[in-house]
Amino acid sequence: MRFRILFLALAVSVISIPAAAQKLDMELFEAMKPRNIGPAGMSGRVTSIDAVHSNPDIIYAGTASGGLWKSTSGGINWTSLFDEEPTHSIGVVAINQSNPDIVWVGAGEGNPRNSQSAGNGLYKTIDGGVTWKHLGLEDSRNIHRIILDPNNPDVALIGVQGPAWGETEDRGVFRTTDGGKILEKVLYINEKTGIGDMVVDPSNPNHVLAAMWEFRRWPWFFKSGGEGSGLHESWDGGQTWTELTDDDGLPKGELGRMGLAFAHNEPDVVYALIEAKKNALYRSDDGGKKWKMINDDDGVNSRPFYYADIYVDPENENRIYRIATAVHVSEDGGKSFRQWQPGYASNGIHPDHHAFWVSPTDPDFIMEGNDGGISITRDKGGSWRFVENLPVAQFYHINVDNEFPYNVMGGMQDNGSWIGPAYLWRSGGIRNSYWQEIAFGDGFDVSPDPDDSRYGYAMSQGGSISRFDKETGNSSRIKPLHPDPDVFLRFNWDAAFAQDPHDSATIYYGSQFVHKSENKGQSWVVISPDLTTNDPEKQKQSISGGLTYDATQAENNTTIVSIGVSPVVEGILWVGTDDGNIQLSRDGGGSWTEVGSRIKGVADESWITQIKPSPYNAAEAVAVYDDHRQNNWEPYVYRTRDWGRTWERMVDADDVYGFALSFIQDPVEPNLMFIGTEFGLYVSIDEGSEWTKWTQGYPTASTRDLAIQEREVDLVIGTFGRSAWVLDDIRPLRELAANGVSLLEEAVHVFSTPTAYQASNIQAEGTRFRGDAIYSGQNRPTGARITYSINPDEYEEAEDDDEEGEGDHDDDGDHDDEDDDDDGDDDDD
């Protein structure tokens, strides 16, 4: 009772500890939950949309790496449904329209770009998403299509695309007739061929077309097309299949990805957008038996590996929507197309489209998803509403400054680089308008100038780097050049950047060389030889793509992807490459030694996605290996304590789920460490001997990057799909790491407290009453934060002892008055 009075008007975190607890049990940390601060204004990649035909206010939206979301208000507000499932990547969502509480979900997006994530199979709910059952296909990785039989809810066809990064038999079309208990493979070509598209005849659920697609991705090359690609037809609900050929009017030779669509009002009309030696749109007027080419303009199918879908107006077989970089529409059966949506205008819609839904009863009502979220029109494209409250931004990197309150910053997939507050003294939460875009393109590292965080550095694809002024908006390009103009610089899609902790004017940047600037990017010098393997077989990005070239620099390889500068001793540099090298310089770049080859147990050519020098020991560093690009999803994190002579593995698949992406060690308590993987956040309080997944308030998320704001002792988390998070005040974890879990056996323990500030929150900027459609990130609670633990057994024993002794002494009356007030009933007697 005394403790309750102590904490009046304070923000209190309570950790209730059973006496027998010896491990870091997440159930005990309910009061320590990270805050999702957003942003949502740029949203993120949406992969699938479906709505209930009889009540289209009920919408399900799948995202590339941000989970599954549901709206029951026509897209005004949204609920995340997959926070606790072991996957966050959604390939397809399909509603059983005869019973909309039944929803099927295929995990793993079907757009195999370089940043594609993956899932773990097939899911189903029978209660509208409250609970989910995993049905199998664990190794399918990417499920792209689901067709439900409208006459039998137990019958479904599952179109598995399969992983881009490897060759497996877990591909093709699967069929179930018992609601998913048994999944039979009914169409299989080879280990490289999966589903590109699959559609059903609206007049005959037994008539199905499946476009099989052979493709393969390597870190340095992508190939679309092969002998396995082709169009297949079934007339018995997918039990048996027949391949259509050039004898039926399809193009000759090697084929790639195809998009398919039936016309609902005229089911004999079918369209196929086909990648071939000459990409073209084909049409059938007899339900798919015979085909003819109707449009082979150069732009009709410009980037099929990333988007190749077509849709037909349900009331007009000649009105076709083609989704690609922009959405285009044809009114003449595909003979000609025009851009349908506004582009880079003030009312523009984000490019790169992947999901499309047209109401079958109202063709004016359309929803589409792209790399920047969801847009909705109710007048067939005359006007659009952008859904600005889906916090599914895909951060590649995260960082913080030291302003007061401090800011969080980072770059995102196809959505630029942004800076926004970690918390603020305003009502209304952290709104999208409080975030400032400081660079466009695909954003990567963002780093504040330690001398003045008004300025900073922002990276984008192709090695682009700029120095920005966030007050004026001015930005200047500072990309380094090689002194020899004949030397071509190879920059990774996500090139390495680092600041020197010993000199605020010195920065480093990685191509195949390490570039150093001592004047904040005004000039550069090369301080290393080529630190990669320089394998010419991995330098074919300019011809990447297969049937359709796609030379965007996304496959740049034999490059530097991580640079770590020791904060302990000046001049110690660690460098990681995308082809497996770890290079060490102990003299500021004068000489280099390759030390990664001494690591045993990790595959050659793995990416060293991060390399973190120890804040305590100059000879120590931690290397985070990411080998998923060789279809290996295990975590690999290695530590050296002797300049790379020997290495020890810090995690394995029994402790940590998913390939590792990020690591950070607390700069004050060496026993406290965090690891981010493709599927979550893990914490260790014993220097990596044991890891615990952080589940309190944190979803399954690709945890790309981690930062610690040292003044306020916050862990800041950048996710690739769920925006940014802040775990406020990790001092309790520091104390547990320093003293062990035995600390929690005390009856009551009060942890070190952060500084509290008395502040009066001012009104939010802009709209005061925001309703539900305007996003608001979680602000830090007001008041003083005190975290304490209670061991119920010890506390009750101490309380009993205290009560037994109360009759043996008097006090000044305050305690007795408190007890009287608490008891209450005695006064009435």
Predicted regions and their residues:
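Long, acidic low-complexity intrinsically disordered regions
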Residues: 802-828
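Generic low-polarity alpha-helical segments
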Residues: 1, 16, 428-430, 497, ...
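Bacterial N-terminal signal peptides
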Residues: 7-16
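Beta-propeller blade termini and top-face loops
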Residues: 22-774, 781-782, 791-793
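Intrinsically disordered, low-complexity acidic Ser/Thr-rich regulatory segments
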Residues: 551-560, 819-829
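Sec/Tat signal peptide C-region and signal peptidase I cleavage site
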Residues: 17-21
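Short amphipathic, basic-aromatic surface patches that mediate peripheral association
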Residues: 786-807
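Bacterial N-terminal signal peptides that target proteins for export
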Residues: 1-7, 653
